[in-house]
């Protein structure tokens, strides 16, 4: 797979995760509602930024980003969430799994971009990996 193709898959994942985490944000229940509501807001805002950054990089490489939800659904590798009631522990377990998926995808992006001589995408992918690995560590500590 080429760099721009991986970027498109990641862009699809980012928009699906944006919606998925909104679902968690709106539908969490329990005594820790306020903390989880705030935490999930920060997370979905991060996915909005990621979606935009990926789209812009795709354009910079001379390709067209995803512009419809139907395109995103076809390309995503993330499982949508259709339930509408959640407890915080379940939310954070699901987000942790999604972060691990993204970590794998950004490693693939970094390696592929490196082979193609695309240093800018390598830097972007590695920056995302650093953020994801910190988030994974924090969620694992929270769930321990």
UniProtKB/Swiss-Prot annotation:
UniProt binding sites for Fe cation 2: 56
Protein name: DNA protection during starvation protein
Gene: dps
PANTHER family recorded: GENERAL STRESS PROTEIN 20U
InterPro entries reported for this sequence: DPS_DNA-bd (IPR002177), DPS_DNA-bd_CS (IPR023188), Ferritin-like (IPR012347), Ferritin-like_SF (IPR009078), Ferritin_DPS_dom (IPR008331)
Any Gene Ontology CC annotation: cytoplasm
GO molecular function: ferric iron binding; oxidoreductase activity, acting on metal ions
Purpose of the protein: Protects DNA from oxidative damage by sequestering intracellular Fe(2+) ion and storing it in the form of Fe(3+) oxyhydroxide mineral. One hydrogen peroxide oxidizes two Fe(2+) ions, which prevents hydroxyl radical production by the Fenton reaction. Required for the survival in the presence of oxidative stress. Dps is also a virulence factor that activates neutrophils, mast cells and monocytes. It binds to neutrophil-glycosphingolipids and to sulfated carbohydrates on mucin. It might have a role in the accumulation of neutrophils and monocytes at the site of infection.
Binding site for Fe cation 1: 25, 52, 56
GO term, biological process aspect, one: intracellular iron ion homeostasis
Subcellular location: Cytoplasm
Notes on the domains: 12 di-nuclear ferroxidase centers are located at the interfaces between subunits related by 2-fold symmetry axes.
Record family assignment: Belongs to the Dps family.
Catalytic activity: 2 Fe(2+) + H2O2 + 2 H(+) = 2 Fe(3+) + 2 H2O
Origin superkingdom: Bacteria
Keyword list, A-Z: Cytoplasm, Iron, Iron storage, Metal-binding, Oxidoreductase, Virulence
EC numbers, comma separated: 1.16.-.-
Pfam families xrefs: Ferritin
